[in-house]
Amino acid sequence: MRSLVNGAIESDVFELTKAVVRRDVRAAAPLLEHLLAEGNVPQQLLALLLWQFRVLLFASRDPKMAEAERMAKAIRSSSGAIMRYTQFARGLAQSDIARAYESLYACDISIKTGRADSEEAALLLCVMDLCGVPGADYRDFLLREAPRR
């Protein structure tokens, strides 16, 4: 996947992830808007966010370099990426990361099943949920019946 995504997009999504981890919706929403305005596909951005939360999951264990190298092989990343994410993962509990996975998964399913009116709106709502905005929990939409088209 890394070869399909240019470095600028990854860098911007990293900034988006940092804003989400800080629960800073005022920074996260404009970053997402910029990424979408640049023509990035919501599914691609969702995949990158998921990948970054996977790295955060491993980084949250505060690994030493040897352990980070083993972890990196398991997720096809680099030990450097895991070590860089360690500082951002310090304030996150495993439950926070699990909750983020649930939100990202709900967004993905809502897009793929047609429950989302627009992919962009679904992704924005997901980012807002990840930032802790009340009422933005996209998992609730999975409990509803799919719209008839």
Predicted regions mapped to residue ranges:
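Small-residue-rich helix-loop
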Residues: 1-99, 134-135
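Amphipathic alpha-helical interaction/assembly segments
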Residues: 37-59, 96-149
